[in-house]
Regions:
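Active-site metal-coordination/substrate-binding segment of hydrolases
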Residues: 65-147, 152-163, 189, 203, ...
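Zn-dependent metallopeptidase/amidohydrolase metal-coordination segment
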Residues: 4, 8-12, 338-341, 345-360, ...
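Active-site-adjacent substrate-binding region
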Residues: 219, 226-229, 233-249, 403-446
């Protein structure tokens, strides 16, 4: 494990190093919540945990700055638990193994947790610092952002006192975000009665892996391969041409991550197994050709394994309906933002497919900065899966964050950034969900901006943070806090 705690600025890296030692996958936050409360007590920082699982910290103003506007520093404590197929990492119990790789910090075949651990580490650095000049400061460290923004959604009104919100969950240094997409979770389910497999049939497990995957918002515009969408094209052809039957399907594991791996078990007449192997080889060539220049095609694996024939499989009519619905389901960019060239407005991610044992579940995350188009896309999905006889439910909906280009904090941040870096910052809206929109719904008076150091490939085992961005990010934070105006 690389010793990252001595990297500069030590104030942030020391705290991030501590966070890597505490397991904090979404949905399993007891250890990190306890750690943050213990840390705050030891540091002499006022802190408490609210009913939604958020940790709130408070630090009084530097003497003489009590009349300044209050600043809320906000980040989320949970991390996406993704790992390479060969990794045995246990996210609920194991620390993250960090590696210094040139100008980057990464993990050993797992997500790093810099999303949003660096934001949390920055809050800790501000809270414990003795030499910073600032007005009243609060830290809001939210729970389970990655799986539905549950902490932000459960944030009580009246809990926070500040006037300005600095969200620390943007992943390109020098970009200052003033708008983000809304989102909605779509879940289609079906219970079915399995049928007996033909005892004379063979069974083959087909695996597709080695795709990049990635963040289903930030990286959806790159046209990366979705393992579920690639797999359904093969499965439909195998059913049509080789009399194959679907026994099970497992693809993807996070709504907000583009699936990089999918696996199906098919049964088919023994005399067709060789043809199936040839078909898989042909589809591998096709995928590599289609995604050459987008995917690392040398990493793509598409292969078969002979397995014991399962006792049951999906009934033919239900199988055909499911496969057709998955095939027809939209995935990727639906529309670009008309008013912001190069920015995705509306997209969806066919994230998780689980079929087998008499149950089918398909999970999708749709995003849009346009509320009407978000619901249009969600209803499109509902119609698609209703035709397959599935029950469709919407959950976890949150609105977009509408940009305010005349924001006072935006003007202030851009001024400080240019003074320190000698160039203009880039004002952006992002095609990803930020908690800002939800918090603004509860605290509409807040002046909000989001920024942070550069991270690459969040939500994947290739996640990494650029070391050289963290020092200028910290310098901006220190000057910004010292110059917050009076109320």
């Amino acid at each position: 494990m690389a010793d990252i705690k001595n990297l500069s600025p030590v104030e942030i890296w020391r705290n991030f190093d501590k966070l890597t030692q505490v397991p904090r996958p979404s949905g399993h936050l007891e250890k990190i919540q306890a750690y943050l409360l213990d840390w705050a007590k030891e540091a002499g920082v006022e802190a408490f945990q609210d009913a939604a699982g958020n940790i709130v910290m408070r630090k009084p103003a530097t003497p003489g700055m009590e009349n300044r506007k209050g600043v809320i520093l906000q980040a989320h404590m949970d991390m996406v638990p993704q790992k390479a197929p060969e990794s045995n990492h246990d996210f609920e119990n194991d620390p993250i193994e960090t590696i210094i790789d040139g100008d980057w910090v990464r993990a050993n075949k797992t997500t790093l947790g810099s999303d949003d651990g660096l934001g949390v580490a920055t809050i800790m650095a501000v809270m414990e610092a003795k030499d910073l000049q600032h007005g009243p400061v609060e830290g809001l460290i939210t729970a389970d952002e990655e799986t539905g923004m549950f902490g932000a959604n459960g944030l009580p009104e009246g809990e926070l006192n500040g006037d300005i919100l600095l969200n620390l969950d943007t992943e390109v240094w020098g970009e200052f975000v003033i708008g983000s997409a809304g989102g909605i979770d779509i879940t289609a389910t079906l219970d079915y009665k399995e049928v007996e497999t033909d005892k004379e049939d063979a069974a083959v497990k087909v695996t597709l892996k080695g795709l990049k995957g990635g963040h289903s918002g930030i990286e959806i515009n790159e046209g990366r391969a979705n393992a579920n969408k690639c797999m359904v094209r093969f499965v439909r052809e195998a059913i049509s041409e080789l009399d194959a039957r679907l026994a099970s399907w497992q693809g993807g594991n996070m709504r907000n991550a583009i699936p990089f791996q999918a696996q199906v078990v098919l049964t088919l007449p023994k005399e067709n197994v060789e043809a199936l192997n040839d078909m898989v080889a042909d589809w591998k060539d096709e995928i590599c050709d289609e995604f050459n220049g987008i995917e690392n095609i040398e990493n793509i694996e598409f292969f078969t394994e002979n397995v014991e024939t399962p006792a049951t499989e999906v009934p033919a009519e239900i199988q055909d309906n499911l496969v057709d619905a998955i095939y027809a389901c939209h995935d990727g960019v639906l529309r670009m933002a008309p008013s912001m060239p190069g920015i995705v407005e509306t997209s969806s991610n066919l994230a998780i497919i689980e079929i087998g044992g008499g149950k089918a579940a398909i999970k999708i995350l749709a995003r849009s900065s346009h509320e009407y188009y978000k619901m249009y896309l969600a209803t499109m999905m509902e119609s698609c899966f209703n035709m397959a006889g599935m029950k469709v439910e919407f959950s976890g909906a949150y609105g977009g964050w509408n940009p305010n280009p005349k924001s006072d904090i935006l003007e202030h941040v851009l001024k400080v950034y240019k003074e320190q870096n000698g160039k203009d910052g880039v004002v952006q809206a992002v095609h990803a969900g930020l908690e800002c929109s939800i918090i603004l719904g509860k605290y509409p008076h807040l002046d909000v901006i989001s920024f942070g150091p550069t991270l690459l490939s969040p939500h994947t085992a290739n996640e990494r943070c650029q070391i050289s961005c963290v020092a200028p990010f910290w310098n901006l934070m220190k000057q910004l806090l010292s110059e917050i105006p009076a109320k």
